């Protein structure tokens, strides 16, 4: 049967990334308390394509996922990327997995337990070297210092979305990374709060006002103190309660120089 993908292309244009995007597929994530957690990821898989090939073999990406069915984990991402390079005769392979991860949290006063969802990301690239990035998105509460200072009856607050991506010299638990970030807002966010908990969380936020700038700086100091983290990017978006826009701040460390390669795109 004719293989059109392997036919020669005469336009002399190499393609940096080609593959499949947004495949929903079950994966296994290492859980600090329960050994492992099963979840469903949205997966992107790409390879490079030399200028002389007309196309890549799209079906092989899905075949590779099926080959690793039930065994797709953080530990074997490098193996999966190598298989992509081998099967698709590529010099570079890219893999990104976005998935929900659940952690049981306890309310501060009632001690009521509930599952809190966090959006997580694993991203890997394999060419001559391996590059792996772990990302998490953590919701926080932020109370406006200016509003508290000038108001006689309370202060307005925001729900913050803190996005952190890190490169590591050794393994870091998702739970630990999330815990560090949750210490950096006015107050944490919970899935379940009773009245006594709402009172405690509200008062905690009021006693700990923070601008968006304060949050990214606090997270930056936390991550700088972790020797296993070799690079990170922190973004915080505060969804304003009295404005029709958001407040935003970002820190990348080490900072990128003008002639350096840009940080990997999400």
From Swiss-Prot:
Belongs to the GTP cyclohydrolase IV family. This is GTP cyclohydrolase FolE2. GO terms for biological process: tetrahydrofolate biosynthetic process. HAMAP family: GTP_cyclohydrol_B (MF_01527_B). The lineage of its organism: Bacteria, Pseudomonadati, Thermodesulfobacteriota, Desulfuromonadia, Desulfuromonadales. Keywords: Hydrolase. It comes from Syntrophotalea carbinolica (strain DSM 2380 / NBRC 103641 / GraBd1). The keyword Nucleus does not apply. It holds the Pfam family GCHY-1. One of its GO terms (molecular function) is GTP cyclohydrolase I activity.
């Amino acid at each position: 049967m004719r293989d059109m993908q392997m036919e020669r292309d005469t336009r002399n244009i190499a393609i940096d990334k080609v593959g499949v995007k947004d495949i929903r597929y079950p994966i296994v994530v290492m859980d600090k308390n329960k050994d492992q957690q099963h979840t469903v990821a949205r997966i992107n898989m790409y390879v490079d394509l030399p200028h002389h090939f007309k196309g890549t073999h799209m079906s092989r990406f899905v075949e590779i996922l099926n080959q690793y069915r039930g065994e797709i984990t953080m530990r074997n991402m490098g193996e999966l990327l190598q298989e992509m390079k081998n099967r698709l005769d590529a010099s570079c392979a890219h893999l990104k997995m976005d998935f929900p991860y659940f952690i049981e949290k306890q309310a501060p006063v009632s001690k009521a337990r509930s599952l809190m969802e966090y959006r997580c990301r694993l991203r890997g690239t394999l060419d001559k070297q391996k590059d792996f990035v772990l990302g998490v998105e953590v919701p926080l509460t932020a109370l406006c210092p200016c509003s508290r200072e000038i108001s006689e009856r309370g202060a307005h607050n925001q729900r913050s979305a803190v996005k952190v991506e890190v490169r590591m010299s050794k393994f870091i638990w998702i739970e630990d990374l999330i815990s560090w970030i949750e210490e950096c807002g006015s107050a944490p966010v919970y899935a379940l709060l009773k009245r006594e908990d709402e009172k405690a969380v509200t008062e905690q936020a009021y006693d700990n006002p923070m601008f968006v700038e304060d949050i990214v700086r606090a997270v930056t100091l936390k991550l700088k103190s972790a020797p296993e983290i070799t690079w990170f990017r922190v973004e915080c978006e505060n969804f304003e309660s009295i404005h029709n826009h958001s407040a935003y701040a970002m820190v990348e460390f080490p900072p990128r120089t003008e002639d350096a390669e840009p940080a990997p795109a999400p």
